């Protein structure tokens, strides 16, 4: 029996409990009828119930899926702590091809597993999943967030995310140039999706000059036309050329891993401030940027606006309250910049220490959510 237990505790060549040592709970979800195979990871509920999206991806094996969900859920703990919201970190992954493996039955089965956690985990859309998928999950559980307005939710999260990027850019300008004005500066924006396009619009309104790149020609033409209406200038460049333009701030709003050994030598900017997730290819690249004299705004601080809206939705949607809370990104980022300089560490280290201090300051776990409680960022009535 002992030998059998020892054998069953292995995943790949690693002991499963060693692999999940930093996490509270891992739930393997298997429903043979619908074909569902999913993993829910709850990293830390010290600050509150776990919050994190559900992505669907054709992972090669369970090891790869587990590795991804462990990494992503831990990241959510720090994101929630950085945003100073009363939630912890969680994430879910569904193993499958989102183009051909989806079905109403699969998402209803997933909803049942989420419901079984009885409020320890709240989830919504992520890469490979849409709200149309979660309409089916909602038939089985109420622990779904990030809901469109027509379903009683708070709607498009790209609005507060973009606003958070603007506050982050203003804070960076204040730190570097002594004024938080956006005008008179040049920004290199990579990606004009839902967030990047809104950021570009606001920068143009402020009188900034832009270098932009995107894989879709129609959005490039659209923002070029906007510049004629709003002022400022827009220069369209090829994808690889965005790294080497002469600008004040690089604003990555598309893919992750773009700050790496190949791109850093090309950068001619004073700072990197954008909404893209996991911008650093490796943690050591924060040091490389630092050595080159380029200020880095940690991505999970910059893009916290969307997370703030998702968390706020659980108290009852309130756009004014969300934007008020999102404004705190300005102050938080300035604190991180100043602390990093004071301690002679990278901004990533400073941000992580700040988050860890927040978590350690909460001595007891708060694994369940109370809808009767007002958020601490509530607008005074």
Curated annotation (Swiss-Prot):
SUPFAM superfamilies tied to this protein: Aminoacid dehydrogenase-like, N-terminal domain, NAD(P)-binding Rossmann-fold domains
Positions that bind L-phenylalanine: 79, 277
Protein's name in the database: Phenylalanine dehydrogenase
Gene designation per UniProt: pdh
Pfam families given in the database record: ELFV_dehydrog, ELFV_dehydrog_N
Enzyme class: oxidoreductase
PANTHER family noted in UniProt: LEUCINE DEHYDROGENASE (PTHR42722), VALINE DEHYDROGENASE (PTHR42722:SF1)
Keywords assigned: NAD, Oxidoreductase
